[in-house]
Amino acid sequence: MGAASRRDCDLAGNSTKIRGSKSLRKGRVSIKGQPYLITSTIHEREDLLNDAQSSGIVAGALHWLHENNRIDLIAYVIMPDHIHFIATLKSGTLPEIMHSLKSYTSKKINKTLKREGGVWQEQYHDHAIRKEEDLKEVIHYCLNNPVRKKLVKSYQDYPYWYCKWEV
């Protein structure tokens, strides 16, 4: 690995760069028709998505991507500081989809909340879902996130979720 730039070092000059993150992004594969679980986190884990307006912006953008044949949206949950969504790619690559989603929602959320600055962390996590049985488990994992965080007793009580199938 090459020398870290000054901005990638702490005060003592030690590298703070996450090793391998660039190579992981480089090796990212986008397969049309492949279901993915995608997780994206708000910058500095700030609770920007804890209201109907901000969550509605993200939900609206996900549904727009679905309605415009960019993704087949299967499920999502919008947590106060991150989102999980499950979708299959229809057109474009995963990085293109994520760029569209983050760029649009950042501008709208900043305008709505009358704020400036970053909304999303640059990175996101994607996991290709291999089998149909796994897909059901991943949907349950995704939708039950608010339950695990003790925000609600049942995911149906949480206001910011969607699933195209009955679970």
Where are these regions (language model features)?
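Short catalytic/metal-binding and nucleic-acid-binding patches
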Residues: M1-V167
